[in-house]
Amino acid sequence: MEDNKDFKTPPRRGRMGGPRGMGMAPEKAKDFKGSISKLMSYIGRYKIGIFAVMLFAAVATVFNVIGPKILGKVTTALSEGLMRKIAGTGGMDFNYIGKILIIVLCLYLVSVIFSFCQGWIMTGITQKVCYRLRKEISEKINRMPMKYFESRTYGEVLSRITNDVDTLGMGLNQSITTIITSLTTMIGVLVMMLSISPLMTLIAVIILPISVGLVSFVVKKSQGYFKTQQEYLGHINGQIEETYGGHMIVKSFNKEKDMVDSFNKTNDVLYGSAWKSQFLSGMMHPIMMFVGNLGYACVALTGGLLAIKNVITIGDIQAFIQYVKNFTQPIQQIAQVINQVQSMVAASERVFEFLDEEEEDQTVKNPVSTEGIKGEVDFEHVRFGYNENQTIIKNFSVNVKPGQKVAIVGPTGAGKTTIVKLLMRFYDVNDGAILVDGHNVKDFNRRELRDAFGMVLQDTWLYKGTIMENIRYGKLDATDEEVIAAAKAANAHHFIETLPGGYDCELNEDASNVSQGQKQLLTIARAILADNPILILDEATSSVDTRTEERIQKAMDNLMKGRTSFIIAHRLSTIKDADVILVMKDGDIVEQGTHDELLAKNGFYADLYNSQFEQAS
């Protein structure tokens, strides 16, 4: 059908991609500081909660850090007791050891309680932030202009609500506590190591740059492969999505082998990049283990020499070795959380970018009331293009009297559907004006203006729910009797009664449990129930069989009496009784009149009409 594509959402391209792999190179924000600033403004209302999280995380970490040194006293007491027992000068002081173990148990128990509290508070804050963002995005969608959705894919819009908000929430929930815990652990452990032995601390710290250098080398090498993996994961998802969505076309043209070959090529690249990235990423743990063991060996050797000289105790060596492990662990955690923060900020940037998009002006000062609209419509020298380089409607002028049935016909791309979009203010004209009852459409509030129009599109839209609920969508406060009356007027009552449950029959997600013709009848019943003074029928009967079309046509004829109606028709035989037929070509009206008048002119309309019957024969 002609420019009906303007009403359709662009084809899906798999932009949602899929979940980000572990260790994958993070997407970086274009404006890191600006995005962080906006995110902080959302978190700002939870200052007390954030402060409590930081305090609890720090306290829990401090108790954990103190534990090993106190446990070292147990090791020292055991070794000294063993030496006394061997020398025959005494035995184990289990009373002393028991007291220390109780103290350590209490410390770790308090640490767990504080960790639980900070986790509980942070999860609550994160979910509240995500809830608020999702709510704002949902409200924003209803205020966005049509051009935004027609220039983007399904996945690109949906990912703002799903993937991006989830990534933001996950990063927010983990990054703050991880950073606080890691920094507190590093500082606390460093202080405790210095209190045991500055020399051993120096040895442990010297090994640290080796660890950082090796990890940085591996990360740098693997990031390129992770980037390729991420890119081709998106390609894989896109191919699967498109193949599934168009599986009937693929099968009808016997293109299964071509699709499989194309998929295999993409999958081979994904396999190669994923193998290399995961292999290199998997090398990090062995490298850290090697460096860590090297550090343990150096510390143990130095500690043994110092213990022989009675500079430190055996318990101090045991505690110090544990501290060395605790000292390197936060470095890995911070490296991981930095990637997570980058992904979080990039996701928040996309969310805020969406929230900052230009909105439609929903209201005007001193708006014209839509009550009592008669339905007179004037197009005065309207010019419009979706972009500056291409003008679709060049100089469109017409006067439509109240109650007239106006058919708009023309070849593909003539601008028929665009006229309807301008009438409902999905777009605003570049030049000229559109008047309803003598008032410029820009003088109405958009919402109230659109309430004056009833619309039936070629692409039927029904949501998951009962048939009763779907018809009632046209008038939410309608009674069951009004819904049934609308269904009868649309000649839909009979087939509804034959369905399991009748009006309570549950439609599935894409309403595939009813036929295309039945879907069309339900959307017409919805428009009848809405009872708007002006009707727009965009190929309302093009998707149904001839018998169903006849039933619909009779119902629509009754509905259109006394109402201004615009019919965009491809089958010209359906608009013979229109009061006025506007014939469009290249954005202009080239002919207008009744069906008989236009045929008598033997012009462009006659050519269109005759060509359809030639094709049919």
Task: Name every feature range the model reports, one short phrase each.
Residues S35, I43, M122, N142-M186, ...:
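Juxtamembrane loop-to-helix connectors within ABC transporter transmembrane domains
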Residues E2-K5, T363-V364, T370-S617:
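ABC-type nucleotide-binding domain
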Residues I50-F114, S195-L199, N310-I314:
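Transmembrane helix-loop-helix hairpins at lipid-water interfaces of multipass membrane proteins
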Residues G17-P19, S37-M40, I48-K73, V104, ...:
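Alpha-helical segments in transporter systems
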Residues M22-E27, Q127, K135-S159, N163-V165, ...:
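Short intracellular "coupling" helices and adjacent cytoplasmic loop segments at the cytosolic face
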Residues M146-K147, N163-L172, I176, K221-E242, ...:
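An intracellular "coupling" helix at the cytosolic face of ABC transporter transmembrane type-1 domains
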Residues R45, G49-V62, K73, L107, ...:
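Transmembrane helices of ABC transporter permease
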Residues G81, M192-I206, K276-E349, F354-L355:
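Helix-loop-helix
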